[in-house]
Amino acid sequence: MTEESLRPSRLEHAQHPVAIVHEGFFVYANALFLQRLGYRSFDDLQAVPLLDMVDERYHERLREHLDAAKKSAGTEQRHPQTKLTLHRADDLPLSAGCTSFRTRFGGEDCVQLNLTTAGDANLLGRLGALPWRHYLSLLFLLLFTVLPSTLLLKLNINNAPDVYFPDDEPAVVLDRELRTRFPNDQVFVLLFEGVALFSDGFLDAYDGLRRSLEKLPEIDEVVAVTTQDHIAGTQDDFIVEPLIDVRTLAQSRPADRQERVLQDELSKGVMAAADGSALAMVAIPKKSGNSIERLALEEQILAAVQDARLKGYLVAMAGQIPLDVAQLRSMLRDNMIFIPATVATGLTLIWWLFRRWLAVMLAGVAIGVVTNSTVAIYVLLDQPFTLVSSIIPPLLSALTVAALVHLFNGLFIASKLGYSGAERVARAIQEVDRPALFAALTTAGGLASLGTSPIVPIKTFGLISALGTLLIYLVVFRILPNIVVRWDKRPWTNVRGSAHLVDGIVSALYRFGIRQPALVIGMVCVLLALGAPQLRNVVVETNLQEFFDFNHPVREQTRYIEDKLVGTMAVSVIFDADARDGLKDPRTLQLIRDFQQWSKAQPEIDRSFGLPDFVQEMHWAFNAENPAFRQLPDDRELITQYLLIYDGEDIYDFVDRDFQHSQIALNINVHSANDISRVLENIREYLRDNVGDALRWEIAGNGRLFADMEDLLVSGQVYSLWGALVLIFVFMLFFLRSFWAALLCMIPNLSPIFLIFVIMGLTGIWLDMATAMIASVAIGIAVDDTIHV
């Protein structure tokens, strides 16, 4: 590139007003010159002769000065100087010193004018002439690159089920109250298989693992066959002892221990497989904790298994917490893949379209600033970063690339029109700023509509991603142009085979649409008619197990444990009496026992366990283990006596010490929200018909929370869609100032939603937490294209 072609770019960054004149007319002026003379653009200045701009008293002085300047080369150390009074565009006078010399511009001999005003002569004026916008923009990018990165170290990564519900949700309030009395139902279930499971060596190692886990500060209780209460009968009494007492292993044989475990009614199906081929251990945390804490706890448990030399025996681990940990690992792995892939794809696209390293570097910086700053908002607002939140980085990366393409395309067009430097940037911004602003507002509106969702992570995602969209506009159309003015010196040239290919495809499509409107509209109507019936096939369903492949370890291990033992989905049915000791009433216990018998007959319920099981086992043991007495006694005083004699602890996991509040723990073998909802509705129907007002009852637990999420999801989807459509219509109405035009523009905004649900109905994709957000996101992205059209 020649020195002459580089000169305007250098003059743009000069710290004083500079202009070039040829034959008395301006052929170039930098931004400072236009600013000092009060002109908005060079187009306004170009038509004004230099002589008309100078006060009439100085015309002769100007002519003499220009003649002298034509004889002075730019390389000389001293150049002709003079003082002039110029007329600004607003007719105000401007006194300035003028230093001029001969230069080349556009292949012609010209004169370069360098002005020095009163403001430029003093320190404040010189400081004011510095490119502060450039410096401040660089400072902004630096700060918003560094500061968010420090905040991200405090990011609370938490995908635990608790964070998905509002605090005042009835199921949450009920579960919170339940956990004040009874242990957590989100647990680790460990299953061991191998030879000689009931041998001295294995049981010693097994109990050693139990003791190690109990020492962990995060663990509240460990349920194992070596600590589980076993109620044994005598001739006139009963005793409570460990199911297997490791202190007395020498007094028993492995076969006897196995038979004792398999025949124990309190642990049947829970602590051992029916054929004795597997033993279980259940670790119950003190609190749920966030996902990172759960991951750390799982690793501690596995380390304890390793230390106990039982790793070869551990064949499966399941429960809500291992499932959450698997989701966390999947989320982190996917983010490590898709975020770099999205950024790399975007940067490759920028290079392919424009072949300009400056554009690629600015795109990388912009994507980093936008995504890091937006995710850092989670830290500032003390909100958990969930599986839902992980959509933000790739989404905002893609939206940032889209905005950058508009900016760079504007610069390319301005360059083709002959603009350079600040004028090129100003022309590009003038072309794209208004549609870019409305696109940002409407896209943010579509995302913010998710703020109406009652599911907290979806609401937070919508509001924070909306802020991120507005940040894209600020960075791309307000910050980066100041950088481009400083560093963009070369013209933007046509790129063979890239932008031409895209333009060719777009041109072919719109030409076909304009030439064949009836055919296009007819085809669209036919497709709508064919797709509409599929909307009825959209199924609202969530199954966390289905988030993983069928052969994923967490699904395989869950299936294996449920085949060997019982279902891992926990539901608690609460029964409360009106007064203390109310649950000692035989009629009350029989009502609860009848419910248990009914629930055990349901195919989805593998186990129903609670206070009546303990009382029944005490009655059986007290009567010399006579099978005829394995039932509830009908004498309140006898029940009271049994409970007084009982000196174990396991019963208090199911009833409080006042015998007023109790829970029946159900183990369910289904995991989808709809299946769980059907089970819960059947339970409610039974309790309404058979218990009624005789006892206060309610359903709680992890299963209830998960099932209620379905209703929240549906209501949130309806509210967010309507909110997005109304908000975008208002934006369109304001932008177009026409009701019918705004209504017409809603068609391309609704089309992606319609297509999404048609595809979901056709392919059987569920409407769950992940797909529920796609509609609102699609509206926001679709309206971007509508605005630009």
Each PLM stretch: what is its role?
Residues 380, 397-409, 433-452, 457-498, ...:
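Transmembrane alpha-helices and their membrane-interface boundaries in multi-pass membrane transporters
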Residues 120-142, 426, 474-528:
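Interfacial helix-loop-helix hairpins and adjacent transmembrane helices
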Residues 332-385, 453-456, 719-764:
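Interfacial segments of transmembrane alpha-helices in multi-pass membrane proteins
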Residues 98-114:
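Short loop/turn elements at sensory-signaling interfaces that couple input to output
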Residues 414-441:
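Helix-loop junctions and hydrophobic alpha-helical segments within the transmembrane domains
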Residues 176, 180, 248-357, 590-593, ...:
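Extracytoplasmic
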Residues 44-57:
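PAS-family sensory/regulatory domains
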Residues 153-196, 203, 249-271, 510-514, ...:
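Solvent-exposed, non-transmembrane loop/terminal regulatory segments of multi-pass membrane proteins
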